[in-house]
Amino acid sequence: MNVGNTPLIKLSDKLYGKYEALNPGGSIKDRPVKYILDVYERDGYLKKGDTIIEATSGNTGISLAMMCAERGYKCIIVMPSDMSEERKKMIDFFGAKIVLVEEGDFDGAIELKCNMAKQWGYVELNQFNNPLNVECHLNTTFIEILNDTYFDDVSAFIAGTGTGGTIMGVQQGFEKLRTDTKIIAVEPSESPVMSGGEKGLHGIQGIGDGSKFLVDLDK
């Protein structure tokens, strides 16, 4: 399955967007899911017939369900009940089992996922605190940005933030180059956790899940 190498599209004179919707699962989450599964398989952490479980607001669930179907793994997705029906249908289409928790309760989804994995011996993708998530974006997303900009000066990199994998990986890349590129994380105003506020319900699915441990911009 071909993931990544998405185009950098010119939006205005000095503004570009990376078109991650062209990934097979329709989002940037295809990158860390493929990367983590590749490493797990390489290191013997996975075998055919294993069950992989993850808590997600949807995009990672779609990516994981799709790749589990391709690779011969069973898949369980734990998610808040208020996530879009389209996401649920996509996950179901790929044959994954969906377990719902109360709307907006992302911490509850993560806790249930961990408990189920421990009780039944499921393999956790563990996107929220898996260093492979960050490593993936350092080794793929960041490198693609460099190649597409011909190593020219990048004034700022802006990304919506859920797990923090994208922005942390790209940040580490620019730090290695010792550039003064500004790294800007975007979160919903209704759930300004990174800004020191309280989590709340909002309408932007996929970012701003509200768990304070998901993002560490000091790394």
Language-model segments: which ranges?
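PLP-dependent amino-acid enzyme catalytic core
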Residues: 1-219
